[in-house]
From Swiss-Prot:
Present with 3410 molecules/cell in log phase SD medium. The gene is MPC2. Residues 2-22, 72-74 are mitochondrial matrix. This is Mitochondrial pyruvate carrier 2. The chain crosses the membrane at residues 23-39, 55-71, 75-91. Mediates the uptake of pyruvate into mitochondria. Induction: Mainly expressed when grown on glucose containing growth medium. GO terms for molecular function: pyruvate transmembrane transporter activity. GO terms for cellular component: inner mitochondrial membrane protein complex; mitochondrial inner membrane; mitochondrion. InterPro entries: MPC. Disruption phenotype: Grows more slowly in amino acid-free medium (SD), when combined with disruption of MPC3.
Length: 129
């Protein structure tokens, strides 16, 4: 590849509507940090993972994945990072659901735990009720 073609490719990337001078580049680039945090949480014990946090990550990832195809210019980088965020948050929610159901929680208890993070056994210990 000649230096002129490399310069042309770099100039084209630099001046692109989704290039590094725009939020269309930096927002998805920095959002990869959330994906990497989700990957690192796969090593954490499931009891220490927040259901509410992963539900909100899943929700925003779904919304922004859809939105990245609606906005002009269409932003594939934003769609890709949010797709991976959706996968990691969904996986973590699956881990939480599997753990809670195997330990005897009903579906309603599981939903309550994911939405509020409240654990009835912890309330009894801390409040004395």
């Amino acid at each position: 590849m000649s230096t002129s073609s490399v310069r042309f490719a770099f100039r084209r990337f630099w001046q692109s509507e989704t290039g590094p001078k725009t939020v269309h580049f930096w927002a998805p680039t920095l959002k990869w940090g959330l994906v990497f945090a989700g990957f690192s949480d796969m090593k954490r014990p499931v009891e220490k993972i927040s259901g509410a946090q992963n539900l909100s990550l899943l929700s925003t990832a779904l919304i922004w994945t859809r939105w990245s195809f609606v906005i002009k210019p269409r932003n594939i980088l934003l769609a890709s990072v949010n797709s991976f965020l959706c996968l990691t948050a969904g996986y973590q929610l699956g881990r939480i659901a599997n753990y809670r159901i195997r330990n005897g929680d009903s579906i309603s208890q599981l939903c309550s735990y994911i939405l509020s993070g409240a654990d009835e056994s912890k309330k009894e210990i801390t409040t004395g009720r």
